């Protein structure tokens, strides 16, 4: 009988612990942190907490295999860090540019389409995970990419010394 009560008590304690710890460990980012550049004119927007969560989930599911931690496994010289995004042609350091890239990816110099070798909406028949993504999904993914340098700083795109 003691075993039954002790197991029940342990289970209840575990559940109570999870309620408080899990809710406290959810990332609560302030508006300043969630503010990201939306276009090449420098306009900004504040991502909602839902967009932040959705962007992270979608990025991990569709992009994370090759871009864990903001690196590019197939080309370590080109990452998703702010400097690399700003030096690309066209610049990809804002949400609308990243959404455009996710629809029609080009080489770093912008001269050739790489839709056949890089997942995109244009190549959804080759990369099925891209098939069901909406514009809002792409916006959330781009928001995640823009937000990460503010959260993990130099680790984002920092390479294998961090990840």
Swiss-Prot record:
Domain of life of the organism encoding this protein:
Eukaryota
Q: What is its main location?
A: plastid
Annotated protein name in UniProt: Photosystem II extrinsic protein V
Please give the organism.
Thalassiosira pseudonana
Q: Which GO terms describe its biological process?
A: photosynthesis, light reaction; respiratory electron transport chain
Which lineage do the record's taxonomy fields give for this organism?
Eukaryota, Sar, Stramenopiles, Ochrophyta, Bacillariophyta
Pfam family name, one: Cytochrom_C550
Amino acids binding heme c = 63, 66-67, 130
The residues that cross the membrane are none
Membrane protein topology class? Peripheral membrane protein
- Which keywords has UniProt assigned to this entry? Chloroplast, Electron transport, Heme, Iron, Membrane, Metal-binding, Photosynthesis, Photosystem II, Plastid, Signal, Thylakoid, Transport
Extract the NCBIfam families matched here: PS_II_C550
Q: What does this protein do?
A: One of the extrinsic, lumenal subunits of photosystem II (PSII). PSII is a light-driven water plastoquinone oxidoreductase, using light energy to abstract electrons from H(2)O, generating a proton gradient subsequently used for ATP formation. The extrinsic proteins stabilize the structure of photosystem II oxygen-evolving complex (OEC), the ion environment of oxygen evolution and protect the OEC against heat-induced inactivation.
Gene3D superfamilies the record matches:
Cytochrome c-like domain (1.10.760.10)
Cleaved signal peptide residues = 1-26
Q: Where in the cell is it found?
A: Plastid, Chloroplast thylakoid membrane
* Required co-factors: heme c
Question: Which GO molecular function annotations are given, in alphabetical order?
Answer: electron transfer activity; heme binding; iron ion binding
Q: Which family does it belong to?
A: Belongs to the cytochrome c family. PsbV subfamily.
Q: Name any GO cellular component annotation.
A: photosystem II
Q: How does the cofactor attach, per the note? A: Binds 1 heme c group covalently per subunit.
């Amino acid at each position: 009988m003691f075993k039954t009560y002790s197991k029940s008590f342990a289970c209840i304690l575990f559940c109570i612990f999870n309620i408080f710890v899990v809710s406290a460990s959810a990332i609560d980012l302030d508006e300043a942190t969630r503010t990201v550049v939306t276009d090449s004119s420098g306009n900004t927007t504040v991502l909602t907490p839902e967009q932040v969560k959705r962007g992270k989930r979608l990025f991990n599911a569709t992009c994370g295999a090759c871009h864990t931690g903001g690196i590019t496994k197939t080309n370590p010289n080109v990452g998703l860090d702010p400097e690399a995004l700003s030096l690309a042609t066209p610049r990809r350091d804002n949400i609308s540019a990243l959404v455009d890239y996710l629809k029609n990816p080009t080489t770093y110099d912008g001269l050739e389409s790489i839709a056949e070798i890089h997942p995109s909406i244009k190549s959804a028949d080759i990369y099925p995970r891209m098939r069901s993504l909406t514009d809002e999904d792409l916006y959330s993914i781009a928001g995640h990419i823009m937000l990460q340098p503010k959260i993990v700083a130099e680790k984002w795109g920092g390479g294998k010394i961090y990840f």
